[in-house]
């Protein structure tokens, strides 16, 4: 996509986000307001989320440390990362802890493990929402945010839950496997979820220094076939490497060690993608976030109407405003389609079809949940029913969206 076309499309998307808060305020749901705020913030900052995902102890944090060129993120023998950690470019080092309450606290770098690890913050007892780290790294474009996530499949179920909830916020994913063992059933199920939500996935097999060249080739061949079967894509490129060796080489400025780690092949491919394809993927990801938000709003309003939780007049006004917003979005989408190449139009159309299907399924699921829940509050007074149903409705919709 040419620069002028990209800028026009991004302006259209930013215009959509200006109206998100208005829509969420009309719906009167704290969960939906929070969702609208997070989408709006990401799009306004033009942030591209490169999310590193994988099972616990695959070496995700070590690989990110290589990208940063420093031992910044805690690593160790036990499962460590317990909260979402975002690293963005900054000329100076800065660490902010954002709590679930919305309060932000700046901390020294050497206190990072007190908030982002199981050792320092077991089961997230400190109620940390995310950690944001500003760091002067030159590995990627300055608008790229590297996201470290808790490993799935450990004894800490909350870590798995946090990571699953972040998948749909990803613009591109680095999926980290390793040679010990190659790919597990847990990882296969995890990858299935990722492939449903993310268009660009880089596959890394870490710890390649722990086995022979012949065994690596066998592992790559086996893993490639498994991934093809899961993603239904024929062109799968896997990068075997040693993140630990690469990091040690970078810190000690040992070029021979870096070359031996095989990380440079992955690094070159990633940089090329960020240079040539990032813009298209980012637009598609932003459109998908907006579509997902509209699906949540639509489901909320439809269920409000069915349950008559809101006064009918207010519901009708909200639905009318929502439909007007939908019409504006669709009109602007038409302009976006004209600016894209033919193949991109096909991709966007498939997105629309997929999201329409998701919206319909969402309404059915939410309605069933509400119907199943209603008997538990049927004997309460009307005002108490409304209060319980409102809370349950918000929770059910956000769970489905996550």
UniProtKB/Swiss-Prot annotation:
InterPro entries: Dynamin_N, P-loop_NTPase, TRAFAC_Dynamin-like_GTPase. To M.genitalium MG148. This is Uncharacterized protein in xynA 3'region. It holds the Pfam family Dynamin_N.
């Amino acid at each position: 996509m040419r620069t002028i076309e990209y800028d026009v499309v991004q302006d259209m998307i930013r215009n959509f986000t200006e109206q998100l808060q208005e829509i969420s305020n009309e719906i009167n749901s704290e969960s939906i307001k929070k969702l609208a705020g997070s989408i709006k913030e990401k799009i306004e900052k033009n942030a591209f989320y490169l999310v590193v995902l994988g099972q616990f102890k695959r070496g995700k944090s070590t690989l990110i440390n290589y990208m940063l060129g420093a031992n910044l993120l805690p690593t160790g023998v036990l499962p460590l990362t317990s909260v979402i950690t975002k690293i963005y470019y900054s000329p100076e080092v800065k660490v902010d802890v954002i709590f679930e309450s919305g309060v932000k606290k700046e901390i020294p770098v050497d206190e990072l493990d007190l908030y982002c690890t199981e050792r320092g913050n077991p089961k997230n007892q400190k109620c940390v929402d995310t950690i944001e780290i500003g760091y002067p790294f030159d590995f990627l474009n300055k608008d790229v945010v590297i996201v470290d996530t808790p490993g799935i499949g450990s004894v800490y179920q909350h870590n798995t839950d946090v990571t699953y909830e972040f998948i749909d916020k990803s613009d591109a994913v680095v999926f980290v496997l390793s040679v010990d063992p190659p790919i597990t059933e847990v990882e296969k199920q995890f990858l299935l979820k990722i492939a449903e939500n993310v268009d660009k996935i880089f596959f890394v097999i870490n710890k390649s220094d722990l086995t022979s060249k012949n065994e690596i080739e066998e592992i790559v061949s086996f893993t490639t076939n498994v991934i093809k079967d899961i993603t239904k894509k024929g062109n799968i490129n896997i990068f075997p490497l040693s993140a630990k060796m690469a990091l040690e080489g970078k810190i000690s400025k040992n070029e021979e060690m870096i070359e031996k780690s095989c990380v440079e092949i992955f690094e070159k491919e990633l940089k090329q993608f960020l240079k040539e394809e990032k813009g298209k993927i980012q637009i598609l990801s932003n459109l998908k976030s907006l579509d997902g938000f509209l699906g949540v709003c639509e489901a909320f309003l439809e269920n409000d109407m069915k349950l008559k939780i809101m006064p009918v007049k207010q519901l009708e006004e909200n639905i009318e405003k929502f439909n007007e917003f939908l019409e504006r979005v669709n009109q602007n989408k038409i302009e976006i389609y004209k600016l894209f190449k033919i193949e991109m139009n096909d991709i966007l159309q498939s997105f629309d079809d997929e999201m329409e299907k998701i919206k319909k399924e969402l309404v059915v699921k939410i309605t069933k949940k509400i119907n199943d829940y209603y008997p538990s509050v049927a004997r309460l007074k009307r005002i108490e029913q409304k209060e319980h149903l409102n809370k349950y409705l918000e929770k059910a919709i956000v769970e489905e969206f996550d």
